[in-house]
A protein has these predicted regions:
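Sigma70-family region 2
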Residues: 35-52, 72
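Helix-turn-helix DNA-binding module
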Residues: 102, 106-107, 117-137
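Short, small-hydrophobic-rich alpha-helical interface motif
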Residues: 15, 19, 29-40, 57-60, ...
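Acidic, proline/glycine-rich intrinsically disordered inter-domain spacer in sigma factors
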Residues: 79-102
Length: 158
C-alpha cells in the first residue's frame, strides 16, 4: 500500500465526518472530501511534500466547508431563509443544532465540531492553525455562546 492510499484510508472517515457535520449534507460532504484528496494527490504528484498530512487534510476540509457555507449563505434564496426562521420550532433537534452552528463564526464552528469529534486541544490547535494556549478559553466561550443560541431557538438540552 502506498503513502497516498494509507493516508486516504486513515483520514477519509475523519474528514467525511467533520464535513458532514459542518455542511449537513452527505453528498456535499463527499464532494468536499473528494476535492481535497484530488488536490492533495496533485501536490504529491508535483513533488510537494506535506509534512503532517492528517493535520493538513483536516484543516483543508474545515476550510473548504467554511467556504461552502459562506457561499451557500450568500446565495440562499430569501424565501428559504424566512421559512427557516418561521419554522424553527418544528425542526428536528439535529436541524436546530445545525442552525445554531451556522450562527457561529467559522473558526468557532470548526473548533466545536472538532471538539465534538473527540480531538484533543493540541490537535484542534494544529488543525485550526491557532495557538494551543488559546484553544481552551476560545472553546469555552464558544460553547457558552452556542448554549445561548440553542436556548434562544428553544432547543431542549438534557
Amino acid at each position: 500500500m502506498n503513502s497516498f492510499e494509507s493516508t486516504y484510508r486513515e483520514c477519509y472517515p475523519k474528514m467525511y465526518g467533520i464535513a458532514r457535520k459542518m455542511v449537513n449534507d452527505e453528498d456535499v460532504a463527499g464532494d468536499i472530501v473528494q476535492e481535497i484528496f484530488v488536490y492533495y494527490f496533485e501536490k504529491m504528484q508535483n513533488g510537494i511534500v506535506v509534512h503532517h498530512p492528517q493535520s493538513w487534510l483536516l484543516r483543508a476540509t474545515t476550510n473548504k466547508c467554511v467556504d461552502y457555507l459562506k457561499y451557500r449563505k450568500k446565495h440562499a434564496p430569501l424565501s428559504a431563509a424566512s421559512e427557516l426562521a418561521d419554522e424553527t420550532e418544528t425542526f428536528e433537534p439535529d436541524m436546530i443544532l445545525q442552525q445554531a452552528l451556522a450562527e457561529l463564526k467559522p473558526m468557532e464552528m470548526k473548533m466545536v465540531i472538532l471538539y465534538s469529534e473527540g480531538y484533543s486541544y493540541k490537535e484542534i490547535a494544529q488543525i485550526a492553525d491557532i495557538n494551543f494556549s488559546s484553544v481552551g478559553k476560545t472553546l469555552s466561550r464558544t460553547l457558552h455562546k452556542l448554549k445561548g443560541i440553542l436556548k434562544r431557538l428553544n432547543y431542549e438540552m438534557y
